[in-house]
Amino acid sequence: MKILQQDDFGYWLLTQGSNLYLVNNELPFGIAKDIDLEGLQAMQIGEWKNYPLWLVAEQESDEREYVSLSNLLSLPEDEFHILSRGVEINHFLKTHKFCGKCGHKTQQTQDELAVQCIHCGYQTYPVICPSIIVAVRRGHEILLANHKRHYSPNGGIYTTLAGFVEVGETFEQAVQREVFEETGISIKNLRYFGSQPWAFPNSQMVGFLADYESGEITLQESEIHDAQWFSYDQPLPELPPTGTIARKLIHVTLELCKAEHKCD
């Protein structure tokens, strides 16, 4: 981090937790003085549109109006990823002010994104928690679940199955375990789909497509309120927001369901 001078220039990432300050739904741009940033701490984390991109240290008291990152999923993908990166780096710096090995204070390294203990020299890098997310298809049907965190009296969001990768697991093993734990369904024909950074606060969602193999839906009641098979040609429940990897998985799977039905 450096102390900003009045003529420091570029795009500015200001965060409060997973919230960001935007101007007309865009990152503020200009010199530090004009955006009332002079004297604050910041670090350059890259470039955006060929200009420096600065992450400003989070302020305890700030009268600016912030917007949740989760409300910005409709932004272009590259812009959403820039915002996510800022949120994740901010979270890392806030939660690693002290050494996890000896408890002394840390300081940022000069040549890479990391913090180092000023006492024992132990170096820590941003923590990324890998999670899997999978869409399961059975013929012309897709398996969707209403997680307890998404439940509402009107039904709530139905989405794909997901969960964190456990220590010692492959991504493929995690997918098979999560699907079976949450719904009692066994799957086959597992294939990679894509990934999405998920800064809530520091996950990396790794997406898969899979086909039904066997089993009847048996809910993991501590996690899942409801799970059902939905046909592509029937009304669907409320789905995750556009821009999420969950919504992309659902869209692709519904297209596969439609193609399967045409071949019958």
Swiss-Prot record:
The keyword Zinc applies. The keyword rRNA processing does not apply. Keywords: Hydrolase, Magnesium, Manganese, Metal-binding, NAD, Zinc. A divalent metal cation 3 binds at E178, E182, E223. GO terms for biological process: NAD catabolic process; NADH metabolic process; NADP catabolic process. PROSITE patterns: NUDIX (PS51462), NUDIX_BOX (PS00893). Signal peptide: none annotated. It holds the Pfam family Zn_ribbon_NUD. It comes from the Bacteria. Zn(2+) binds at C99, C102, C117, C120. Its cofactor is Mg(2+); Mn(2+); Zn(2+). Belongs to the Nudix hydrolase family. NudC subfamily. Homodimer. This is NAD-capped RNA hydrolase NudC.
